[in-house]
């Protein structure tokens, strides 16, 4: 006898539902006989009519047709292209509601994935002004009716939505990009056409130093030749004295990858500079640098607090990137060792250490799970281990290395609560106890949340 279950809904069916929760990407979740239906823009507690648009074996997708009751946290999105862009997922939710939803998400995965429901999870540290916080704008360029368009891809497509401004983007970047678009149009620069693999300008990127006010402009082109380059640069430099660097990156490949291999400075310096707290950073076109420096300082201050350094410790910073956390730690530690797999990031880390006259930070290139045991054999004994892995979390070999090395304290910075909970569980099974988790809202109006946890050896 077949045990195959038939989904309790059909495509194009209209049904009334109550939303119970939000998914990790911000969709409302309703259930019919335990069968989940995901609906964009639905909020917990709301009663609504939805239309079923796709039916799968274990779940369905619906479209919100009509609200019967509204959540007290619902609001109109402030961005006119919110429903098309996809850059933000939560503008229809008040900021207070966003912070509560993120806290609930972390509490849920800590229990469900990590079995750590007893660990204190502190409310999210949000922003006083959760707008215009991004210091980097990276926009595709297209052509429409003879003119250039610059903006963002329509959700799920490569159709460019022309945008004059983005409400989460630094106004300085928005203003510059709109003017660059006008100047390029005036000088006859063509936009890259993905289908025909023709045209010149693929993307424009602007990076803004929030503290210094310095701006870097990057042209990403299909060909090395940029027509009327000299006139374009002169006009931009005259109009925007805060632009300290203009760079061209050439990407001739038919690919979705934005950057190519060749980068050339056209004007000014290879770097702009910015500060997070008292630490100065040199930022190149390709450098990884946190896009919300105000909240990055909040995150790093909490990391430093959890590391509880008194000046006598040796600290290892795994996945150290350009050394941003390492240099924060080096302010208080005796010695910091940072490791990162990307060689260019380690060059940036060394440059940033020199820029801040920090001689107690040392950096190595390679996989953390390979380099750290090598250091251990050379006599580097970490009192405190700090990890800040990518979304996939820590490599299993690194977790085993930590358990074998037995640093007294581990501080785990995470951009993915699910992999954080998974990895904390492994560390707990290896002799550690998670003490607390602090959440930081680095990306308001999106579903992303940063966490920092600390564990002690028991």
Curated annotation (Swiss-Prot):
Keyword entries, A-Z: 4Fe-4S, Iron, Iron-sulfur, Metal-binding, Methyltransferase, S-adenosyl-L-methionine, Transferase
GO aspect biological process, one term: rRNA base methylation
MF (Gene Ontology): 4 iron, 4 sulfur cluster binding; metal ion binding; rRNA (uridine-C5-)-methyltransferase activity
Annotated transmembrane regions: none
Short name of one Pfam family: TRAM
Domain of life: Bacteria
EC number: 2.1.1.-
Active-site residues, Swiss-Prot/TrEMBL: 415
Residues where [4Fe-4S] cluster binds: 79, 85, 88, 166
TRAM domain boundaries: 8-66
Record-linked Gene3D superfamilies: 2.40.50.1070, Nucleic acid-binding proteins (2.40.50.140), Vaccinia Virus protein VP39 (3.40.50.150)
InterPro entries named among the record's database cross-references: MeTrfase_TrmA_AS (IPR030390), MeTrfase_TrmA_CS (IPR030391), NA-bd_OB-fold (IPR012340), SAM-dependent_MTases_sf (IPR029063), TRAM_dom (IPR002792), TRM5-TYW2-like_MTfase (IPR056743), U5_MeTrfase_fam (IPR010280)
Binding site for S-adenosyl-L-methionine: 290, 319, 340, 388
Alphabetized PANTHER family for the sequence: RNA M5U METHYLTRANSFERASE (PTHR11061), TRNA (URACIL(54)-C(5))-METHYLTRANSFERASE (PTHR11061:SF30)
UniProt xrefs under NCBIfam families: rumA
Family statement: Belongs to the class I-like SAM-binding methyltransferase superfamily. RNA M5U methyltransferase family.
Protein name: Uncharacterized RNA methyltransferase BA_0333/GBAA_0333/BAS0318
Naturally occurring in which organism (per UniProt): Bacillus anthracis
């Amino acid at each position: 006898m077949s045990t195959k279950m038939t989904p309790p809904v059909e495509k194009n069916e209209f049904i009334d539902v109550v939303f119970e929760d939000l998914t990790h990407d911000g969709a409302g979740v309703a259930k019919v006989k335990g069968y989940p239906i995901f609906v964009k823009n639905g909020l917990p507690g709301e009663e609504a009519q939805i239309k079923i648009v796709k039916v799968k074996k274990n779940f369905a997708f619906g479209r919100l047709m009509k609200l019967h009751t509204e959540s007290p946290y619902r609001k109109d999105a402030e961005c006119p292209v919110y429903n098309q862009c996809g850059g933000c997922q939560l503008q229809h939710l008040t900021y207070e509601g966003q912070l509560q939803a993120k806290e609930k998400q972390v509490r849920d995965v800590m229990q469900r994935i990590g079995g750590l429901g007893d660990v204190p999870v502190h409310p999210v540290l949000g922003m006083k002004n959760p707008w215009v916080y991004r210091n980097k704008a990276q926009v595709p360029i297209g052509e429409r009716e003879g003119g250039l368009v610059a903006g963002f891809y329509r959700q799920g497509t490569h159709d460019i939505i022309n945008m004059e401004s983005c409400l989460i983007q630094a106004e300085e970047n928005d203003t510059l990009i709109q003017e660059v678009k006008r100047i390029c149009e005036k000088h006859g620069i063509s936009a890259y056409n993905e289908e025909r693999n023709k045209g010149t300008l693929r993307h424009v990127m602007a990076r803004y130093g929030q503290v210094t006010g310095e701006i870097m402009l990057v042209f990403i082109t299909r060909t090395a030749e940029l027509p009327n380059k000299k006139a374009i640069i002169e006009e931009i430099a005259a109009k925007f004295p805060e632009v300290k660097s203009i760079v061209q990156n050439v990407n001739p490949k038919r690919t979705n990858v934005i950057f190519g291999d060749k980068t050339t400075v056209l004007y000014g310096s290879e770097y702009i500079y910015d500060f997070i707290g008292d630490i100065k950073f040199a930022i190149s076109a390709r450098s990884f640098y946190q896009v919300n420096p105000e909240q990055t300082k909040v995150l790093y201050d909490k990391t430093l607090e959890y590391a509880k350094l008194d000046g006598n410790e040796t600290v290892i910073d795994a996945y150290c990137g350009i050394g941003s956390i390492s240099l924060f730690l080096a302010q208080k530690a005796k010695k910091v060792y940072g490791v990162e797999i990307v060689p260019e990031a380690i060059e940036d880390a060394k440059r940033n250490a020199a820029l801040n006259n920090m001689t107690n930070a040392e950096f190595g290139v390679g996989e953390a799970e390979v380099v750290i045991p090598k250091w251990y054999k050379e006599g580097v004994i970490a009192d405190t281990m700090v990890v800040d892995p990518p979304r996939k979390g820590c490599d299993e070999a690194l977790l085993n290395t930590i358990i074998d090395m037995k640093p007294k304290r581990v501080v785990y910075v995470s951009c993915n609560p699910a992999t954080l909970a998974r990895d904390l569980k492994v560390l707990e099974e290896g002799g550690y106890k998670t003490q607390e988790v602090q959440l930081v809202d680095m990306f308001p109006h999106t579903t992303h949340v940063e966490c920092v946890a600390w564990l002690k050896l028991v």
